[in-house]
Amino acid sequence: MDVTEIAEQTLNTSCLSPACQQQDYAEIEKRYEAERHQQLQTRGKIPDVNIRTNTRFEQFSKDPWLDDSNKRQQIQYHQRRHNGKHHKVLIIGAGYGGLLFAVRIIQTGAFTADDILMVDTSGGFGGTWYWNRYPGLMCDVESYIYMPLLEETGYMPRAKYASGPELRVHAERIADTWKLSNRAMFGVTVKSLDWDEVGKHWSARGLVLDYEKDQSKKASLHLSADFVMLASGIFASPKIPDFTSILEYHGHMFHTSRWDYGCTGGSPENPKLCKLGDKKVGIIGTGATAIQVVPHLAQYSKELHVFQRTPSAVDKRDNHPTDPVWWNKMLQSEGPGWQKRRMENFNAFTGNEQPQPAVDMIADGWTSMPSFSIIGGSPESNATDYLHRMKAFDFPRQERIRARVRETVHNKEVAEALSPWYPGWCKRPCFHDHYLAAFNRPNVRLIDVRQSGIDHFTPKGLVADGREHEIDVFVFSTGYTTSRSSPGGRADIAITGRNGLTMEHKWQNGLATLHGVITRDFPNLFFPGPSQAGTCLNHTYTLDQLATHVAYIISKTLIKIGAADAGYSPRVVIEPTKEAEEDWAVQVLARAATHGALSQCTPGYYNRDGMASAMKSLSMEDKMKLGRMVSWGEGIGSYMDQIVNWRGQGELRGLEIHCVD
């Protein structure tokens, strides 16, 4: 079924003629533009609180989950064991991305687990699934394709969309399976990476937390490594907007990624928030996290005040337990390679690849939304009518979402405030079966701040919508810091390559990479995009394919110099030629136009809080610089074709390789 057929099925049956539909579309477009214009006029970019230096918020940068003294002692043992040593491979980040880097290079046979050191600021494996333990947490992409290495570990997820605790335990399962549990150094903050041109290695410096001293005492970190892989994730640290007089508030505050069960009651495994029965709770933010949190807060709080700037588009979820009989039949019928094929089936539908597969294996809200390919790209993205075709699909879909709000929420004013008036690709689509219904509860109040914003905090709460709201507990569902552009910047690591060149400078002044994973003058340093690499909705697929690509580059290089066996690896220096990375940057630029549709969106993190709307006023030089920072514009399938064909040539074309000894 093509996009037109899907769109026709969701059209308002009271308006079926083409002329009527065009009139409806024109009216909707006017409403979208009015909403965007209003938010651009009233929505200033609020600076973020520096949670590392502000004493009121410093607890947000600490690890609240290490209450096991044995675990703390084990972490400190590995800190002492690994600090000050040289390692063949240093992986910064111990979430799914870091684990995939480790597993894929081990699978090449060129390295063992003992050659690898993983470091992370947290106290365990999991990345975002380590830090986030809020009530209602689950993945919003099908767990059978989101949870990596299911085929290799033999694990069957409990439900179509797995819970947070299950996702965290799976990270630990991967570490145990590949003997990585003893190759991790937790409580580590890498502050700088410097290339040693004489020694041909990377030097990492930073801080190591002392968990026995309430995470207040920090020792110096010094490591060196032949290869470094950055896998610290897309979102570096919790974002707390620096609202006016926020420090004057006397009540309790916490961020969703540092959920305080001591305040709310319950636990990640049993989130009964029994301590909120006499509390007025305020949650700020209504993005993908809040969609999962609000139903739980609504159930247990005396009062829940939801402060909303832009409503999310919330479709149905329809989660259900995994049927073991179906699972075993699926494994038997699909055979080896089933997970990768299932992932790519999902990519084909969400990336609007043509022709589409005969069977939609996932069959959920994502795969029936080809218009979201505006974000990740599609092979047809550069077609002159592509945006028009995606709008033709998206208009009726968004109207169906708004109709769902009207049907579910009893109060008409609240329903209108919860209705999304923007294209479906402007804000991450959400899927939940209980969020909208929560606003029918008598203890839940929606405060719409899209026009006036949050004015200021007071000792008892905050002022918004012209009056003071007294709140006992504030929950910040305000996302993560995303302001910096380079892989080092997002991880808050100062990276300096050859001849004193910083990564931030290169990203801001003519970024060029080879395939979005390596850049000249930063030898042996690898990163998983997203600039100049392919991206897709299922982020673990992207991470896995980039990890596989990096593993190929390193192992093929070692084969080329005659050192392919683990245990014998003379030092080698790998980086792209200037010509190769410039050629790749030009190819990225040629496909960058697809991202221009974001300028028509309400402000959000997809368009850097509306900055895309200011593109017209930039010089051509600045536009070209920004164009180099985007992801591959034709979608993940096209990107994979590029790198698979490159590997198929077997020449490591575009790479400069030097053997050190």
Swiss-Prot record:
Major subcellular location class: membrane
InterPro entries: FAD-binding_Monooxygenases, FAD/NAD-bd_sf
Binding site for FAD: T128, W129, Y130, W131, D140, V141, Y146
Needed cofactors: FAD
UniProt keyword Zinc, yes or no: no
Disruption phenotype annotation: Completely abolishes the production of novofumigatonin, but accumulates asnovolin J.
Record protein name field: Chermesin D/asnovolin J monooxidase nvfH
Source lineage: Eukaryota, Fungi, Dikarya, Ascomycota, Pezizomycotina
